[in-house]
Structure formats: C-alpha cells, structure tokens
C-alpha cells in the first residue's frame, strides 16, 4: 500500500511546479512591473535601482566567464591555426549578416515610410536634448575603437569589465598555455576546476533576475508611460515586425540550412530572451547564453570566441534600427535622401555599428555617431525618437541575442566543432536535414 504512493512521489520529483521555472518568474515580474509603472508611475520610477543592481551583478561575473571559457577552450586546441580560422569565419559571418540587417532596415524604411507626413521643421527641434549622445558619439572613432581593444593593464581590463579587452587578453593567454604544452597542465586543470563554481555563481545570480526585470520594467513604464508609444506607433511597429521577420525568415533560413529549427532555438534560450526583455540589455544574458551554447554541443573554444566578439560586431537588431531610424528622421523632417545619400548612410553605419556594446542605449549613441558623419540628416532629429528609444531597446537587444546564438552554432558547424546529437537533444529533437558543412553554400 505504501509502495505506490512512494513511486508516485518519486516520479513527480522530476517535474518542478511551473512557477519555479525562471522564465515564468521573469515573465510574471515583467507583467507586474508594467502594471505598477502604469498605475503608480512615481513609485515605479523609484524602482530603477533594482534593475541597475541586477545588471551590475551580471557584469561582475562576465569577465571571469569570458576568461575561463576562452582560455581553457584555446588551451585545449591541438591546432592553434584553428583559433585564426574560427575568428576569421566568425568575422565573415558577422560582416555578412550585419550588412544584410542594415540593408533590410533601409529597404523597409523606403517601402513603409513610417515618418512620411509628419512635416516637422528641423529648426524647431531642440539639439540640447540629444547633445549628450552626440558628444559621446564624437568620442568614438574607428582607430580609437581598435586601439582600445588592447588593455593598458590586465587588471584594468577586468576591473572595467571591457568585453573586448578581456577577450583580447584571454585569447593571448590561451594561446600561450597551448604553446607551453605539458608544463601548463596544472594551470589549465586549475582553470577548468574554477569553471564549475563560476558557472554555479552565474546560476545563483540568475535567481535575482525576476527582481531586476520587475524594477527595470516598472521604471521604464513609470517614466515614459504607455502613451509615449502611441505617438510614434508606426515606427515602433515597423521596427518590431521587421526584427521579427528577420529572426524568423532570415535567421530561420540560416538555421534550417544548418540543420536546426529557429523556433526550437528560441524555445531553448527563452530564459535568456525574457531576461533581456526585462532589462533591455543583451549583456545581462551573456553568461547564460555562453553556458547554453556549450550545453547545446558547441565546443567551448568556439563559444568563447564567437559570443563575446559578436556582442560588438554582430548586432543585427541595432543595425536594422540604425538605418530604419535614420530614414524615419529624414522622412519626418521632409528631407529627401537620394540613393547616393542612402548608400553613404549605409557605408557609415557599417563602420560605426561595429563599436556598439551590448548595453542599454548603445544603439542610440551609435545612431548619433552615424548621423554626425552624414550631413543630410540632422542629428537634432534624434529628439523625435528619444522618448520611445527605451521601448525599441528591448527589440534591439532580443534580436542581437538571437543573432549571436545562431552565429555560434553556424560557426561551430563550419569548423566541425558541433556535436549534432547533443544539439538535437538540447533543442528537443527539433532539427532538420543538415546541409553540407563549411559555409552557407553547399560544398561542391
């Protein structure tokens, strides 16, 4: 009589109540934050420290996660030329799809024309509203961005939490470990042993995700209000629909060609997506995404190189936003851009977008950098979208995250560093017929 109930209890142990899942908690927190911010806006704006504190907690652990993942991954490579190949293929992928995202934003803006008919006089715009963003944009330069990748000190790179500086040192340190050979085994073993508690710490910190998402969303709705969305609903709707189609159609086609389902991938990283939705920062999900991609069958060396690099060089959502928003401003202020002007805008955006970090508001600063170089579109026109940029930030961050997840799997497969059986198991068996490895085109 006792055995049956005990068996039933044992079977039920494998299934956690739905409310204990992180994604359910984050989703509920986002909904609660929206309601609180709408009905009690003053109180909602006071909850901003909750979101800021959570993002700081995550940033605290990003540098150790990148260092351990990259250094141990490269140290375990028998062929150091693979490091160059992985980096080269990743940059080729980033350049291709980042440019495609910019072009799609340009095409959609010309077809839909979300700013047409607003007839705003550029002289009536207040340049002081965006002066801070413009100043930050002028501080950016291609040469400065590239030289800034090299840290002044190793400690400084980790203390500042600069992703590219930490990645730069981690790659060099991993190569040094691999070149030393057997003598470096104690160091490699120590770093491998350190990886487990660091990722356990990530899991512990993620328990606070619902609190962070609640505070960030309550602040956003409380400060900007739902009403600010309605004023520029055409632009917001166009951007969200374009980004969704980019993920489902463009990235979906890439995923299908490389043997997996984009829908299954979205389901697999749903906790990271909801975390980004709540905080508007794709950086908040970086440690979790790296862990998930490794569990999905991508070798650690590929994950460690592709994802951190992608956070500066593979921002599909930010790229769609940049060309779409630039043309919206031109249309709203009655400025007719020739195809030559639009091509110039595209070329400038291709360069300026490469320095955008995965933090809240980086897309707006990058847009300012682009417009400051293109004389046809007034930088002051950014004041038109300043109030709604926070609502578009979520979509940018979500699209960026999915783009980097797809890129990791594709590059891993190109390098034959992908365990397809493990990927199928992680995605719930939702994989398709695998195209030939080596690139986007079938091997001849």
Curated annotation (Swiss-Prot):
PROSITE patterns (alphabetical): NA_DICARBOXYL_SYMP_1, NA_DICARBOXYL_SYMP_2
Domain of life where this protein originates: Bacteria
Bilayer topology term: Multi-pass membrane protein
GO molecular function annotations of the record: fumarate transmembrane transporter activity; malate:proton symporter activity; succinate transmembrane transporter activity
A Pfam family per the record: SDF
InterPro entries: C4_dicarb_transport (IPR023954), Na-dicarboxylate_symporter (IPR001991), Na-dicarboxylate_symporter_CS (IPR018107), Na:dicarbo_symporter_sf (IPR036458)
Alphabetic keyword roster: Cell inner membrane, Cell membrane, Membrane, Symport, Transmembrane, Transmembrane helix, Transport
GO (cellular component) term, any one: plasma membrane
Main subcellular location: membrane
Entry's localization field: Cell inner membrane
Transmembrane segments: 17-37, 57-77, 92-112, 139-159, 161-181, 201-221, 234-254, 320-340, 368-388
HAMAP family: C4_dicarb_transport
Protein family according to the UniProt entry: Belongs to the dicarboxylate/amino acid:cation symporter (DAACS) (TC 2.A.23) family.
Function: Responsible for the transport of dicarboxylates such as succinate, fumarate, and malate from the periplasm across the membrane.
Protein name in the entry: C4-dicarboxylate transport protein
Organism name: Rhizobium johnstonii (strain DSM 114642 / LMG 32736 / 3841)
High-level lineage: Bacteria, Pseudomonadati, Pseudomonadota, Alphaproteobacteria, Hyphomicrobiales
Name of the coding gene: dctA
